[in-house]
């Protein structure tokens, strides 16, 4: 599934939110990426798609929690070429419960803090009902890919998808 949604709020007016989800994608991850506005001028002499990328703030929700701030910085050397670098904030807790352990533990203890309230569920279904009834044809994609090519076209005007690169906690790089 890939779609663009807008939040009906003065604070988020005109800001697109791109959502992508699927089965058997290249990587299992849950991330929120906030792309900042690109500078009004080209800062470095390099060319290519990475040269035009804006800075961003990435929140990795799973498989581990982490935050990364990405900025284009000058690559070491005489050439005035930029590199995208991420500064990571990790909160490694060796005895931390997995999300399912915590959820089940809270359910058994009667703690409803991690569970969605009824009014929030109804609001979510009000949005999803429209998606389900006004759906587009299903687009097939190759297992192990990032999804159908049509999903890429949805965000081309805003610079394309930022695919999850690696697990920020362990540093395991995705291929």
What residue spans do the PLM features occupy?
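Secretory/organelle targeting and membrane-embedding segments
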Residues: 1-175
């Amino acid at each position: 599934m890939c779609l663009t949604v807008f939040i009906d709020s003065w604070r988020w007016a005109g800001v697109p939110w791109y959502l992508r989800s699927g089965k058997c994608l290249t990587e299992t991850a849950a991330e929120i990426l906030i792309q900042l506005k690109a500078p009004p001028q080209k800062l470095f002499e390099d060319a290519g798609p990475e040269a035009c990328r804006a800075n961003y703030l990435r929140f990795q929700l799973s498989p581990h929690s982490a935050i990364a701030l990405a900025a284009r910085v000058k690559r070491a050397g005489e050439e005035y070429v930029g590199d995208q670098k991420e500064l990571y904030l990790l909160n490694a807790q060796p005895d931390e419960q997995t999300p399912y352990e915590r959820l089940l533990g809270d359910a058994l203890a009667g703690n409803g803090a991690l569970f969605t309230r009824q009014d929030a569920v109804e609001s979510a279904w009000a949005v999803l009902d429209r998606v389900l009834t006004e759906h587009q044809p299903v687009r097939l994609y190759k297992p192990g890919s990032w999804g159908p090519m049509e999903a890429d076209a949805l965000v081309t005007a805003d610079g394309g998808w930022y695919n999850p690169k690696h697990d920020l906690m362990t540093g395991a790089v995705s291929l």
